[in-house]
Amino acid sequence: MKKRLLWRGIDAEVHEVSLGQNFNPNDYDIFFIGGGQDFEQSVLLKDLKGEKGKNIIKAIEDEKVFLAICGGYQMLGQYYKTWDGKQCDFLGALNLYTVGEKKRLIGDFSFKLDE
């Protein structure tokens, strides 16, 4: 993403926010949230239960821009239910949920929200 901005003459700084590290959402213009396997998501979810999660919700409520891929967008939603019925509660910042199936769906998605 940084490289694409630089190609367009837009200067950008990238700040990584690690596990256990909080951030001020007012200090950022855009947020990127990647994904991971179920175990890695469970580790991250523990980290999101505190101030970091509240700050992500605040950034969404303040209409900040997010690019969330893979499990990143799932973690912004209400919950993820695995194909075998286990439910993982997520941030609830967005009114969406994910239900897994035995056969995984992999590819690009596009969503349109009703206002």
Outline where the language-model segments fall.
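Short acidic, glycine-rich loop/turn motifs
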Residues: 5-7, 112-115
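N-terminal beta1-alpha1 cap of cysteine-dependent amidohydrolase-like domains
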Residues: 1-58
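Cysteine-nucleophile active-site neighborhood
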Residues: 38-113
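Short, glycine- and charge-enriched coil/turn segments that flank and shape catalytic ligand pockets
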Residues: 11, 21-22, 81-85, 115
